[in-house]
Amino acid sequence: MLISDTLRFMGAGSDSSPETIELAETAIEKVRSVSTPVSRLTVINSDNKELLRGADIEKHLCGCSKAFVLIATLGPGVDLMIRKTQLQSMREAVAVDAAASACLEEYCDEICAKLAKSNSITMRFSPGYGDYPIEVQPQLLAFCGAEKIGLTCSGYMMIPTKSVSAIIGIKDENYEELNR
């Protein structure tokens, strides 16, 4: 899955040349060698109109009185690697950037899989999806204590760039408190 996602993010297909597949595999190895994935989860009431604005997030959280707010990052080493690689080879930089995106998705999927073991959850829903405004990003990060994992926001862009914020609804019938 990781290799196919990396190829997809590179704009390549599953019928890619052996050279392209090798480029993607090498990029994944490079990203994993510098990646320091870390995340924070916080529970929020789904009626929090300050952080959960818009009809789309309201619809997404239908049947959920609570939700997880997830923030996750691969760490600053990945951003640095992408920038350094851009100076050497844009072809490799595209692959490294794609691999980083795929690794971040994989990390978030692993977190969601753990949550799903004890909760019935929705898919992730991030600021900028539908009418859920990207402008809520700084408030979500503050709500989760993003500074504790080295995650900040410039405008509405997260730093490090290979980072995610997302809302994950917790279906009412299966809500279980976080053991933290």
Where are these regions (language model features)?
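Residues in flexible loops and secondary-structure boundaries
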Residues: V78, L104, Y175-L178
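Internal, well-folded beta-alpha domain core
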Residues: Q88-E147
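Generic alpha-helix signal with a bias toward terminal, lower-confidence helices
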Residues: V43, D47, I82-Q86, C108, ...
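Active-site helix-to-loop segments that bind/position phosphate- or nucleotide-bearing substrates
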Residues: M1-Q88, E92, V96
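Context-gated lysine
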Residues: K30, K49, K59, K66, ...
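Short terminal or interdomain "cap/linker" segment that borders an active site or interface and mediates
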Residues: I121-R180
